[in-house]
Amino acid sequence: MVRVLLDTNTCIEIVRGRRQSITARIQQVGLDALSICSVVWAELLVGAHLSARGYEKEHARIIRFLALPQFPFDQKAAEHYARIRSHLQPLGQLIGERDMQIAAIARSRDLILVTHNTNELSRVPNLRIEDWEQS
């Protein structure tokens, strides 16, 4: 079975419910293929705390993601993170810190990262990415 890790921007689009392409891809791969990581969950929580709607309303919108498997930034991911950063930094092509952590989690677990941030994340070697907003 194909396993995917949802990036924060994809989770936000799922909550908004405005992207037919994302809904279609979820139906195609099945809910069992979806996962998030601790870094994505943290970013979603920050968004809930900063939301103009208020934390409680926004938290109620994102809580469904806790039903998905959630992968931590563990020792294996840390090794991948170190390799990613040490590859990108000398090239002057660093991407965001949390993006590198999310990429490391996906790569360390051989997951496809579903993101709309393909411009930056395509710089990460051996990271499989898909943009379901463009499907």
For each of these PLM feature ranges, what is it?
Residues 7-8, 22, 44, 81, ...:
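Generic structural signal for small/hydrophobic residues in well-ordered secondary structure
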Residues 25, 80, 87, 120-123:
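Residue-level recognition of specific faces of alpha-helices
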Residues 2, 46, 68-114:
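Active-site neighborhoods of divalent-metal-dependent phosphate/nucleic-acid chemistry enzymes
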Residues 10-11, 40, 77, 119-120:
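Alpha-helix capping/helix-boundary segments
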Residues 1-3, 103, 107-135:
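Acidic, PIN/NYN-like endoribonuclease modules and their adjacent C-terminal/linker elements
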Residues 1-36, 46-63, 90, 135:
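Short, well-structured N-terminal submotif of metal-dependent ribonuclease cores
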